[in-house]
Amino acid sequence: MVQSCSAYGCKNRYDKDKPISFHKFPLKRPLLCKKWEAAVRRAEFKPTKYSSICSDHFSADCFKRECNNKLLKDNAVPTIFAHMEIKKKSGKAVKKEQLPAEPEPVPAVPEIDPAIGLLLPPLYTPSHIAVICDHNYTVEDTVHQRRRIQQLEEQVDKLRKKLKIANQKCRRQERSLEKLEREVSEYREAKGSGYVIFPGNYYEVLNENEYKELTPEITYKEIIL
């Protein structure tokens, strides 16, 4: 019985004049044999003791160099299959052919109306319209941001005015406090010397147990206690 390759689409047969070797499925090693079966990718394929795969489906590192590349290593698995490469290439070609070429956008050229001698607005294609719509969204966002910035600036101005008014109130209160402190200090000095200052036109001066009315022209009088 002439040995032939069990790989799908491979027509290699044993020929002593060709440098092709054939390798039996490792039936005694089930795990490795399953890998060979999966690599062959043949539906409902069950290898027998006569099934083999030719050396064309093994990479160079799968062979033992000391045996002139005739014996496989213990963990060698076939990985080279021409039909798989053809399918990949054909699949890529079909995908490229199926994809229609995108038309290049043609810039709109303004036309001149011969009747009035003015430039007419350019005609927009659907792609131009899509771009314009996107630009409108951007413009709306920009307008919204400007309004928001304007509102924030107005709030800042209001807060500055409130802060200014509060500072003015604080300064007035400080001046009032300083005035009261001066009056208290003057009162203490006057009390220490035996004199008391009263406003004119409202009080009478006590002098040697006798009351006398103050004239309207007198603003302040000193009384000896």
Curated annotation (Swiss-Prot):
GO terms for molecular function: DNA-binding transcription factor activity; RNA polymerase II cis-regulatory region sequence-specific DNA binding; sequence-specific DNA binding; zinc ion binding. It comes from the Eukaryota. InterPro entries: THAP1/10, THAP_Znf, THAP_Znf_sf. GO terms for biological process: regulation of transcription by RNA polymerase II. The keyword Zinc-finger applies. Residues 139-194 form a coiled coil. It holds the Pfam family THAP. A zinc finger (THAP-type) spans 5-57. The keyword Metal-binding applies. Keywords: Cell cycle, Coiled coil, DNA-binding, Metal-binding, Nucleus, Transcription, Transcription regulation, Zinc, Zinc-finger. Its main location: nucleus. DNA-binding transcription regulator that regulates endothelial cell proliferation and G1/S cell-cycle progression. Specifically binds the 5'-[AT]NTNN[GT]GGCA[AGT]-3' core DNA sequence and acts by modulating expression of pRB-E2F cell-cycle target genes. PANTHER family: THAP DOMAIN-CONTAINING (PTHR46600), THAP DOMAIN-CONTAINING PROTEIN 1 (PTHR46600:SF1). This is THAP domain-containing protein 1 A. It comes from Xenopus laevis (African clawed frog).
